[in-house]
Curated annotation (Swiss-Prot):
Subcellular location: Mitochondrion inner membrane
Family to which this protein belongs: Belongs to the complex I subunit 2 family.
GO biological process, one term: mitochondrial electron transport, NADH to ubiquinone
An example Gene Ontology molecular-function term: NADH dehydrogenase (ubiquinone) activity
Keywords assigned by UniProt, alphabetized: Electron transport, Membrane, Mitochondrion, Mitochondrion inner membrane, NAD, Respiratory chain, Translocase, Transmembrane, Transmembrane helix, Transport, Ubiquinone
Record protein name field: NADH-ubiquinone oxidoreductase chain 2
Recorded topology in the membrane: Multi-pass membrane protein
Species: Peropteryx macrotis
One cellular component (GO) term of this entry: mitochondrial inner membrane
Described function: Core subunit of the mitochondrial membrane respiratory chain NADH dehydrogenase (Complex I) which catalyzes electron transfer from NADH through the respiratory chain, using ubiquinone as an electron acceptor. Essential for the catalytic activity and assembly of complex I.
The keyword Translocase belongs to this UniProt entry's keyword annotation: yes
Gene it is expressed from: MT-ND2
Length: 347
C-alpha cells in the first residue's frame, strides 16, 4: 500500500467511528458506519493475497447486510416517530431490527460466522483493528439505545455468544482464530449487562481492548500465528512467550489476573438485578474459554521435554524489535484486579 494513502485511510476509519459516536441524527450515524466500513477494507487487504481478498469480501458482504438492516430500522422508526433524531420512545419492530443489525456488525451469535474467518485471513495488524477499533461504533449506538432494547433478544444472543465463543475455540490451533472466538465471548459478556448497567459495558470494553491489543502486540513481536510456532518461540524469547501465555489466561478470566475483573463485576451486577440463573449459565459457559486457554498454556509450557535441542534455552537471544509501551501494557493487562473496589465505586 502507498505510504501516503495509508494515513488517509486510517484517518477515515477514525473519523467514521467518531461521527457515529457523537451524532444524534440517524442518517449521520449510518453515513459514519459506511465511511468506516469502506475505509477498513483496504486495511484488511494490506497483504495482497487470495486469503485477504476473501476475508475482505466476507467482511464487506456481512457489513453491507447489517447496514441495510440498520437503514430499514431507521426508516421504520422515522415513520413511527416522524423525526431523524434519537428518541426515548422507539418502535418495537425498529428496535429489534436495529439490535440485529448492530449485533451483526459486532459479531454476536448467531451472526458470528464471519469473525473467525475474516480474522484468520488478514494480517495481525488488520486483525487488531478488526477486533478492537471496529467494536467501538456499534457498541456506542447500542449504549445509546440501551433503554429501548428488547431484553429477551439481547440476553439470548449474549449467552449464545459466550457459549459459542468457548466451543469454537476448543479445537483451534490458529492463534488469530482463538482471539476471534475470544472476541465473540467477550462481546457476549458486554451486551449481557448492557440493559442493566451500560457504564459497565464501557468499562468491560476498555479492559477487553487493553488485553487484546497487548496480546496482538506480543504476537507481532515474535511473529507467531499458530500454537506450534508459539511453542517453538520458547527457546528464542522465553520472557515474551511466558507473557503471551499469561495474557491468554487473563483473556480467559483466570483470577487474580485482569480478565477476571469484568466477569466478576458483571456477575455481581446480574445477581443484583435478580438474574441469578443467567449469571450462573454465563459463569459455566466461561469455563469453556478458560479450559482451552489453560490447555494451550499447559501444552506449550509444561509438556516440553527439557533435553531436546528445540526446547533448550539459548545462551544468546536474537535481537527483536520491542515496542516501548509493551511493558506497561502487560502490567495493566494482568495486574489490574486490585483496582476492583475503585471501579465498583465508580459504577
Amino acid at each position: 500500500m502507498n505510504p501516503l494513502i495509508f494515513p488517509i485511510i486510517m484517518l477515515t476509519i477514525m473519523l467514521g467511528t467518531l461521527i457515529v459516536m457523537i451524532s444524534s441524527h440517524w442518517l449521520m450515524i449510518w453515513m459514519g458506519f459506511e465511511m468506516n466500513m469502506l475505509a477498513v477494507i483496504p486495511v484488511l487487504m494490506k497483504q495482497y493475497n487470495p486469503r485477504s481478498m476473501e476475508a475482505a469480501t466476507k467482511y464487506f458482504l456481512t457489513q453491507a447486510t447489517a447496514s441495510m438492516l440498520l437503514m430499514l430500522a431507521i426508516v421504520i422508526n422515522l415513520l413511527h416517530s416522524g423525526q431523524w433524531t434519537f428518541t426515548k420512545l422507539m418502535d418495537p419492530t425498529a428496535s429489534i431490527i436495529m439490535t440485529l443489525a448492530l449485533t451483526m456488525k459486532l459479531g454476536l451469535a448467531p451472526f458470528h460466522f464471519w469473525v473467525p474467518e475474516v480474522t484468520q485471513g488478514v494480517s495481525l495488524t488488520s486483525g487488531l483493528v478488526l477486533l478492537t477499533w471496529q467494536k467501538l461504533a456499534p457498541l456506542s449506538v447500542l449504549y445509546t439505545i440501551a433503554p429501548v432494547i428488547n431484553s429477551d433478544l439481547i440476553l439470548t444472543m449474549s449467552i449464545l455468544s459466550i457459549m459459542i465463543g468457548g466451543w469454537g475455540g476448543l479445537n483451534q490451533t490458529q492463534l488469530r482464530k482463538i482471539l476471534a472466538y475470544s472476541s465473540i465471548a467477550h462481546m457476549g459478556w458486554m451486551t449481557s449487562v448492557l440493559i442493566f448497567n451500560p457504564t459497565m459495558t464501557l468499562l468491560n470494553l476498555l479492559l477487553y481492548i487493553l488485553m487484546t491489543s497487548t496480546t496482538f502486540a506480543l504476537f507481532m513481536t515474535v511473529s507467531t500465528t499458530t500454537t506450534l510456532s508459539l511453542s517453538h518461540a520458547w527457546n528464542k524469547t522465553p520472557l515474551i512467550t511466558t507473557s503471551i501465555l499469561i495474557m491468554m489466561l487473563s483473556l480467559g478470566g483466570l483470577p487474580p489476573l485482569t480478565g477476571f475483573l469484568p466477569k466478576w463485576m458483571i456477575i455481581q451486577e446480574l445477581t443484583k438485578n435478580d438474574n441469578i440463573i443467567l449469571a450462573t449459565l454465563m459463569a459455566i459457559a466461561a469455563l469453556l474459554s478458560l479450559f482451552f486457554y489453560m490447555r494451550l498454556t499447559y501444552a506449550t509450557s509444561l509438556t516440553m521435554f527439557p533435553t531436546t535441542n528445540n526446547m533448550k534455552i539459548k545462551w544468546q537471544f536474537n535481537k527483536i524489535k520491542q515496542m516501548k509501551c509493551l511493558s506497561p501494557l502487560i502490567i495493566l493487562s494482568t495486574l489490574t484486579l486490585p483496582l476492583a473496589p475503585a471501579m465498583m465505586i465508580l459504577n
